[in-house]
Amino acid sequence: MILEWYWLALIGFITLFLGVFAVWKTQFKGPEAGIKPRMSDFARQAVTKAAEEHKIKLDFSADSIASIDKILEVFCRRHRAEPIAEKELSRIVLTWGAYVGTTLIKHHGGEWQRDSLVSGAYTYPIVFLKPITSNADKTIVRLSEAVPVMWCLKRIRHGFTESVAMRYKNVVKN
């Protein structure tokens, strides 16, 4: 009799937990929920800023990433002359990094995340799951990340040796 109550209580608890989880999942998507639309907004802003402020047309093609290096060189020179305030620098790298990342996702898949397993919190990586091997029993995947926002930050701080276009090509190649 006690054993029956135990199982009934356990089943009831599991059912309650699954119900609460289902409600939570539909109403609260967690910190990752708004990242994709925010990064899409930043990417659209990059296209507008490139045209208006730099007279460069961006079209979300892989070839357009070289233009991002040219734009970031302007910020690099400005930053060397007088350091850009951190808040403004964050906005700059989010805008241009979002464009690079959106282009990468468009052509090669992946998904925006807020935090990186490698680079840390608020670095906005793109996460890729790539199948390595597959057989009837299992598929082994490799998890990899690209951090275009951080690429843009390094490009501004360190100059042409931190080319965003080269990093993009390396990610695509691998």
Can you say where each PLM-predicted feature lies in the sequence?
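Core hydrophobic alpha-helical transmembrane segments of single-pass membrane proteins
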Residues: L10-G19
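N-terminal low-complexity, intrinsically disordered segments
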Residues: F21, F28-R91
